[in-house]
Amino acid sequence: MKRRTFLSFLAYSATFTHLIGKQAYIFQNSERAKALSDAGNVLLLLQKQKKNVISLVLQGRKFKRNVDHHYPHPKGVHDESSGYRVFFHGHRNGEYGHFHTFIYHPKGYTHLLMISLDKSGMPIMMSTLNQWVTNDVHLDEQEMIEAYSNFSMDPGLFPDKRSYYFLSYLLKGYKTEIITLMKERTLALRSYFDINGKNPDTDEKLEILSSFHIHTSDLGV
């Protein structure tokens, strides 16, 4: 009798664990869908106003495709309270421009993600970069994931709050993909070291460590 009771308990526990896991999966998917939908809604609203995310950060200024020209301000937007910084510029082939996101910490600052846009302001790719690109301080995989997961800035620091909300929704919605990017970044660094016997941080032939393409259908636009 005791054995039967114990086996029943195990079966119940397994079923309960499965249900909890399934509910967590559904919650994560619904959270993802909402965040990406919110990002898409920002884009759709801007389209109706004949604007886009790029026009929000340019604020009527002429866009100069130059690595040294940053928008919306010369030093971008820096939230000293949270330690995060964002700026937009353009200079790479295959895109119109991109946002850089950074975290400032006791060791210095570290680049988190590059978010590439096409000319219409639609997001097309997210990437992690080699150190020489932004001359930053290396953080390990777990530190990168933690810094990304805590991304938060004061929307009032942006000339138009919608540009911040768009970035925030996008980063939240693609959490699974971004964490994978961070892991692939680690693998790329290890692979380079195994092959070349040195770190890749100063190798200017290696710019992007990991990336994934964004499908605007995810955003409902």
Model feature map: region roles:
Residues 5-24:
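N-terminal export signals
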